[in-house]
Amino acid sequence: MIQYLVILLDDTSVSFCHYGNGHKERRLMPADTLKAGILYGMKENLNIQFVYPDYDLPEEYDKIIESVDHSKIKPASRQKGADVVVIDGIEEAGRTDVRSGTAYVLRTDKTGLFGGHDIIVKLLQHADRLNITLTDVETFTDDDFDKYKDMLKQLAADVEKMYAEGHSPQLNILTDRMMLDKMNNCGAGDTTITLAPDGNFYVCPAFYQQPGGYAIGNLKDGLDIKNSQLYRLDHGPLCRICDAYQCRRCIWLN
C-alpha cells in the first residue's frame, strides 16, 4: 500500500540515497504539475516529501509547497528549513554546520568512510540523527568488510560515550541495528513512489535520475506498476529471512 509520495522539484534535485543524479541541467517541475502532484497526494492521503535542488526556488513554488503538510529534503548548501539535509561526501561534511532537530544524510564512498572517522564523530556530536549511505557498496571486497567492521567498533565506542554524557544520536548503521525488531526498508514501489518533473511516476528517484529507469504511471492515468508484488518484502526470498533490519533493501541496486 502506497504511503509516501516523493516529489522531485527539479531534474537536479539532490540524491539522498545510493544512486548519483545523472542530470546536470536544471529543469524545474512546471507549477501546474506540482499542483497536480500535491492534489494527487492529498486525494490518496499520502505523506509528501519534496526533494530540492541546489538553488532557491521561485517564490510562487514556495507558496504552492506550503499549501500542504510535507517534509523537505535539501542539499547541505540550502539547509534552511529542511527536515532532512543531504551532505554529499566527507569533504562537504567537514564544512557543514550541523544543528539539532534535523536529520542528516551523509553520502560517501568507502574511501571517505574509512578515512572520515573524526568528521563522522563531529557530526554525531551535534546531530540528532545521521544516516550514512555508501555510494559504492557494490565494490566492497573482503578487506573492505574488515575495515568496515573496525570502523563500526570505533563508532560504537564513540556513541556509547555520547550516550553516557547525555547526548543520544541515532546512526543508521549502528543504533538502528540494535533498536529495530523488523525490516525498515525504503519501500520503493511498495510503500513509496516518486513523481518527477516530467509528470511521470517512478519506483524511486534513481529510476528517473539514472539511465535505464522506467516510469510506473503518470498524473493523468494514475499508477501502472507491473508485477507490483515483486517490490514487496514477502517476495524477496533472501531479504525476507534476513535480520539486517537497518538495510534499505535498495530496489535500484537489485
Give residue ranges: language-model regions.
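Short, well-ordered coil/turn segments that N-cap beta-strands
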Residues: M1-Q3, E44-I48, D69-S71, D128, ...
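Short beta-strand/turn micro-motifs composed of small residues
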Residues: L9, Y52, L106-T108
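Conserved SAM/AdoMet-binding glycine-rich loop
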Residues: D11-T12, I38-D97
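The −1 position to Zn-ligating cysteines in a subset of zinc-ribbon hairpins
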Residues: S13-C17, N185, L238-I241, Q246
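Radical SAM enzyme [4Fe-4S]-AdoMet core and its adjacent flexible, acidic
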Residues: K24, M29, D83-P197, Y202, ...
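Residues at the N-termini of beta-strands
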Residues: N47-I48, V84, R129-N131, I241, ...
